[in-house]
Each structure stands twice: as C-alpha cells, then as structure tokens.
Amino acid sequence: MAQVAGKKLTVAPEAGKPPGIPGSSSSVKEIPEILVDPRTRRRYLRGRFLGKGGFAKCYEITDLESREVFAGKIVPKTMLLKPHQKDKMTMEIAIQRSLDHRHVVGFHGFFEDNDFVYVVLELCRRRSLLELHKRRKAVTEPEARYYLKQTILGCQYLHSNRVIHRDLKLGNLFLNDEMEVKIGDFGLATKVEYDGERKKTLCGTPNYIAPEVLGKKGHSFEVDIWSIGCIMYTLLVGKPPFETSCLKETYMRIKKNEYSVPKHINPMATALIQKMLRSEPTSRPTIDDLLNDEFFTTGYIPSRLPTTCLTVPPRFSIAPSTIDQSLRKPLTAINKGQDSPLVEKQSVPAKEEEMQQPESTEPADCYLSEMLQQLTCVNAVKPSERAVIRQEEAEDPASVPIFWVSKWVDYSDKYGLGYQLCDNSVGVLFNDSTRLIMYNDGDSLQYIERNNSESYLNVRSYPAALTKKITLLKYFRNYMSEHLLKAGANITPREGDELARLPFLRTWFRTRSAIILHLSNGTVQINFFQDHTKIILCPLMAAVSYIDEKREFHTYKLSLIQEFGCCKELASRLRYARTMVEKLQSSKSGVAHVKASA
C-alpha cells in the first residue's frame, strides 16, 4: 500500500470489479454532507461547490467546532485503483504537507473513509490568475510585478526545500481575499533527492512545458523558471508565448524557441522574459536571481491590490519620487477600449489623480459581439430539449461574476438610473450620459464624462459644477438603502482601497418584462420583473449566472450547457438574452438609455 508519512491510503477494489478498473460515474458514491476525520474526530460541513479538476471535486468545508472555513479536495477511491494513481496522490499529499509558506496554499490535513480521500486546504476565495487573465487579458506592469514577486517568493521556498513544482501556470496561482498569490496543485511536483539529480519522467502535461521536458533529456529546477517566464509573458502580453491552436505546432515552437515579444512591452521586461525562456536550462537565471533583476529593482511594486483588479485595471497613484520619470508611464490607471484619452480636468482640484490611456485591447462594443456569438451557439442546440439533462455538470463556480447590480431605481424621467453594485458601491447614469459612482467607503467618488474620461475625487472636495449630481447620488443611495432588497449579494466582497477602480453602467433599457443593464467590463445583466429571477452574462468567462426564484445563485459555462443541457426556465431566458444583446448592439455606443419596447 502507498503510504504518506507513516499513514496508509487504503483503497479497496469495488465489489464485483477486479482491481485496477475505475468505476463508472454512475457507481461513484454520493459525497457525504458531514465529513468526519476518524483520527482527530473533527467534523466538517460540506458547503458551496467550488469546482472540479482531474479526479477531484472541490467544496468549501467548515470545521463545525472552530467554524474555520477551508477548501476540501475530495477524490473518489474508484479513481485511485491503479498503483500509479495511488502513488501520485500519495506524493502530492506528502509534498504539500511538508510545506508552510505565505505564498503556498496551506495544507490542513487529510483523511479518508471507504469511498473518498479528503484533503483539507487553505481556501482561496478569489480563484486564480487564470480567471483574472480571462477577464483582463494583459495587466499593467505594476500588477505583473506584484503577482510575479509573490510567485517567485513561493517558488524560492519550494526550491530551497528541494521541491520542483513542474506545473506552474496561471490556473495554479491562487488568490485569497487579500489578493495574495498562493502556489497550489502539487499533482506533478517532485522532490530532488540528491544534488544534480535530473528527473526523467513526468506524468501529465504541464501548461508551460519546458523544451528539456519535451526532449526527455532530464530536467530539474530550471523547468519552473521557464514556466515563470511564460507566466510573465502571458500577464504582460495577454496571451501565452508559444500558443497556437494545435498542440503539435505549440510543441514545435517550444523546441525551436519560436516566440516574439511585442514592441510595446518595456525593454527591461522583455530582457527578463528572454533570459527565463532560454532553450538551454543552465543558461536561465536561478530562482534567487530573479528578484534582483532590474525589472523588479527599478520598477514600482504595489504593496497590495484591490479586488476590483480582478475585472478592471487599477488606478495607480504617481509612483514614489525615487523612481525614474521614464518609469512612471505605466503606473497610471486605464479605461481600455474607449476612444478618448483619460485626462485630468482643469476644473477639478489637484488632489485628483492623473489618468493615462494605454493601448486599447478591448472592442468598442464591450464584447457584445462575442456574447451574441456565445448565445447563438448555446441556443442553437436547444439545451432544454436533450433526452438527459445534467445541468449540475455545467456548473463552474470559478466563473462567478466579480460585480453585478444588486439594486436599481429608475428616475430617468427626471435625472437618470441609480444602481448599487454587489460591493455596496452606488452609481448613477445621468440622462446627460455622465456617470458618478460613490465607493462603498461612502467617501471616494469616480466621475465619468460623456467621452469616458475618468476623474477621482471625494465627498469632501469636488468642483462646484458637480454639487447637484453628488446631491442626487446621495438621494439615490439613501432611497435604495431604505427601500430595496439586495439581489443575490450573499458573496461578501473585500473593502476597496486607494487603487480601486469600478466598472460603470454603460447602457440600460427596460422592456415590458425586464430591465437590461450593460456594465463597462462587458457584463450584461437581465432582471425579470414577474418572478424576480436574474441572469448575469460574462462574455470573457463565456458564462451565465442564474439567480432563481429562491434567490439561489448558480454559475454555468455556456459551452457546458451546450454539452449537458439546462432546465426550460434557464433556456428561455438565454433565448430572451440573445434578442436583448442584439438590441444593445444595434444601439449607438455610449447612449446611456436605449429606447425599447420588446
């Protein structure tokens, strides 16, 4: 039997099945609601489904005594019948339980019953850099430094403990509520037993595979440096360096070292990427060299980032005075995809922050074309008419939206539409197509002109011209606070901070049966009047969240709805959504209120 530090993983063959044949999905037992560690007698309540990957399903689990919340990775033993499967799981647990570092996912124990192995891990509520990448594409340079520095510190710790991760990628770099990076998923990790050992085998296919692994020449710590190079490239450029639509072609490019860094990338960043992506492993920098590179030593690294960065770029205060003027350019915030540069208004006090427009990467229609295509595909297969519907298989909690509208009030006959986002910030889209947002601290303000230029101020200091709008904003805020029930807002977002920027309401309209709201980060929300159900569509995650009559919140990948089907109620709302997105698309960009009667 495989052992983990003196403890056996006991896996018995299923009744009526010879050893080594995993059970079919229908024979997999139900995961219990209360998980009991037989050794410590600790009891955990299984809560929200967090996602699945490989053999495992992940749930939020709560220690019933301490009320601490963890992530529970649950693996059916029917998936661990073959010796290599068992050994892989044993190695993963043995490595992870030996680690303890701020930037490595915390290990809090493991146990088993007759049907499952349970691994108790630190909960990272903000998912991973993969979801951030899907929503944001390229991030700002200070953000890239922030995420990379923490990844490097975590990897430095691994290497000092003779552990090679071997699968560093965006999806394995998790984020907690404080937006701190935690390296996770040690399924492909290995321990170096002696100096100079070169590993020859690697089960599975890492995302950012190094050329020496492809060449089966033997590999060591340098594979993690290669992966960090790929991660850095992806964060700054918005796509991986060797990515093609064909795996064979991608591997060919890796072997030939065929990639190019776009000209707009900072030369210091380009130089560091090129060092990490050298074909010869011994020519790459070591993990200890990386943070001494000038990309990190001469560039601004924020001490923390707001959770708003998960979906919109932050705003950066002008960098500390010790930093060279030429390095200040990438530090200002951005509102990508708009026609006009973001400039500081002369009429606004000097406290406001200077804004700058980077290269636009977002489409002018804020991803409505992509959303229309996604809805057309899902509706074409008639997902509610499948012989067998397994809607729960289409669930993807990692795609939960960061922001949605939790309250709204229509005063457009006089002033505009007031709304509250799920983080308790409040905005008004005025009839003159300007927007004003008050952050959840009740003090910070974001003002967006008709041409989409942004200004930042606060309720204590603002130009006289905004007095009426700020008074109206406060009126809307008080009205919604006193009279309206909050929609689906049981997910508690973290306090914003001085770098936060919020998405704003771009366009809206009402029909006889619903209100349609389009946010500047691409999200489209439809609230149905009759039954108070809601759908929230995200084109970047290609996902839909459905808040049903019971106010239960579920998020599904549209491609998985195509595959597994969905209930009639959701299918009819997706059909309606397609018509509404067409209407949004046909309206003029920047028009605050679209006339609609459907």
UniProtKB/Swiss-Prot annotation:
PROSITE patterns, sorted: POLO_BOX, PROTEIN_KINASE_ATP, PROTEIN_KINASE_DOM, PROTEIN_KINASE_ST
Keyword Metal-binding on entry: no
Main localisation: nucleus
Region (Disordered): 1-26, 336-360
Bridged cysteine pairs (disulfide): none
Posttranslational modification: Activated by phosphorylation on Thr-201 during M phase. Protein levels are down-regulated by proteasomal degradation in anaphase.
Reactions that this protein is recorded to catalyse: L-seryl-[protein] + ATP = O-phospho-L-seryl-[protein] + ADP + H(+); L-threonyl-[protein] + ATP = O-phospho-L-threonyl-[protein] + ADP + H(+)
Compartment(s) where it occurs, according to its Swiss-Prot or TrEMBL record: Nucleus; Cytoplasm, Cytoskeleton, Microtubule organizing center, Centrosome; Cytoplasm, Cytoskeleton, Spindle; Midbody
Residues with the Phosphoserine modification: 25-26, 260, 326, 340
Oligomeric form and interacting partners: Interacts with plk1 and kif2a. Interacts with fbxo5.
Protein name, per record: Serine/threonine-protein kinase PLK1
Protein's organism: Xenopus tropicalis
Gene (UniProt): plk1
